[in-house]
Amino acid sequence: MINGDIKLASIPVNGTNELIIKNINNATAINGGLMIGNGSSVYLSGKNSIFNGNISIDEDASMNLSVGNANVHANTITLKSDSWLNIDTSIKNWTQDYYTLLSSDTGISIADNSHIVQYNVLLTEGAESYVYTSLNDDDNKLISMLRWNNTKGMGYGTFNIEKDATLNIGVSLSDNLSPLLYDGWDGKSLTKSGNGTLILSATNNYTGNTEVKSGVLILAAPDALGRTEYLYLSRGAELDMNGYPQTISKLLTAAGSVLNIHGGSLILNNGGESAGTIAGDGSLNINGGMLDITGNNRNFSGVFTVNKGAHLAVSTADNLGTAFVDNYGTLTLNSTSAWQLTNNISGYGNVRKTGAGALNISDNAKWSGMTDIIQGTVILGNADSPVMLGSNQVIVEEQGKLSGFGGVAGNLSNSGIVDLTTYMPGNILTVGGNYTGRNGLILLQTETGGDNSKTDRLVIKGNASGSTRVAVTQAGGTGAETLNGIEVIHVSGNADNAEFIQTERITAGAYDYILKRGQGINSTNWYLISRKDIPVPQPEAVPENHDNNLRPEAGSYVASIAAANNLFVTNLYERQGQELYISHMTGEENEAGIWMYNKGKHNRWRDNSSQLRTRGIATLC
């Protein structure tokens, strides 16, 4: 307790007169007043400095206060002309809507030409302050508040924090609806600039945008981003979610930025574009719209959740990192080069393959929704680890291709290419549902021999319909007679409306192989046969002899032999040459007589199967 007034007399020019008052046990009671004379300075740092008398600050005198560390009360407080009130606003933990610096029983009088000066070491040099100090409406308190909440024309939403400095905002930020705002601020958007760190440790309610231009923004409470419309992260900026859940409308991040999920949960109601880095663990949930990810996220080990009606688009393995994908909407994998998909993908959503590259999937592909191969190739597993894709519907578009080992659990629609060929024949692709041909192409490899020749096969457990072209590559074999043929397509269900059409000629040795539907109980299957007809299998019946498909070139071989046999036939007289004689009358040498050889032949032949017929006409003169 101090009894009496404290007076700092006026001092001459270049003199000093300073007083520092600190509180003891959070309270300093002075039974008197405080008069600060011309040129003198008083530093008050007590949180509860109470003067029972009056406080006056003369011309060129100053009072120095710190926000959060000073709360000075007096009967009356007067700041005279050209007096100075210096306020340090460098409070690191802003946990109140406002801080009271001065309070008075009867009022605070501030001369028009007095000076209230704020300084803040947390601010980047030259930056606008986020703090505003003024009298309250009753003129009995001098308070400092966040300019965010100022409704008198100075509202401001930018926090420009100096490098290595940290500011924690622990009060809730709501929309400032005042028509008078500073420097074009919309009253509802937060901007973090400067290379320092801003922490939002309260649940907020603002509805504008959140933009991190530089430095770090740390979220230390649920919904610290309020109801943010757009979240912008500029190059070099970082957002640390610090384990808390947040919901925003749209995410827009630039290359070189970092979004650290850090065990938190970020919900996007309208997708966005992510060119920066996503790191940490936790979850990123897409409730609606499309999120297009192009950044390197190899350090993200969390979960992407794509909800119904939402869309996630990625183009490289790094875009997904090592994250799981729980897909109930649409996932687009746009690969322009080879991509071994190692991420676990589940859910009943649809998967779209675009881009000219090949996508190789293994047993981590657990989705059950539709798979649409629009461009490029989807490769199922490998020879040692075949994959049965769980999709209920696989669509191969005109520029798409399905290949590999295993099959699809559901239906298959083919407008593009289904490629069963590998390094050797014998691959089997299984369709668990129905197959629909839409003028697509099936590629097979076959050894051209008898019925038991090695071949690739398409096995359809359900029904088959539509038209499909089939191209067969010969993989060895010298040709042989077939009985039923080499089965290449097997349909367990109905195939009445299916048509598989051979695209190119298949020859081996003396045989032509053709693709033909089976007969009788085999009428739902397609075979490569070297026979003209497939017999209808009868129980306990002995197969009849049937003619095989002979190559038409054989007829030309026979005709060539016949021509060669006639071409060089001559007679004895021709071999002897012409006879010469000398005329008795003239003594000249002459040729004797005339000689001619004329021979013609006509022949016809055919094989006993009547497949090959040849006719030859030969004339020799």
Role assignments for model-derived ranges:
Residues 1-81, 98-125, 200, 234, ...:
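Extracellular beta-solenoid/beta-roll
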Residues 169, 273-274:
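Secreted peptidase-domain scaffold signal
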Residues 157-167, 171, 332, 339, ...:
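Transmembrane beta-strand segments of Gram-negative outer membrane beta-barrel proteins
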Residues 199, 537-621:
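Outer membrane beta-barrel translocator domains of Type V secretion systems
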Residues 213-214, 479-494, 610-621:
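Short secondary-structure subsegments characteristic of cysteine-rich extracellular domains
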Residues 127-131, 136-181, 186-191:
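Extracellular/periplasmic ectodomains of large secreted or surface enzymes and adhesion receptors
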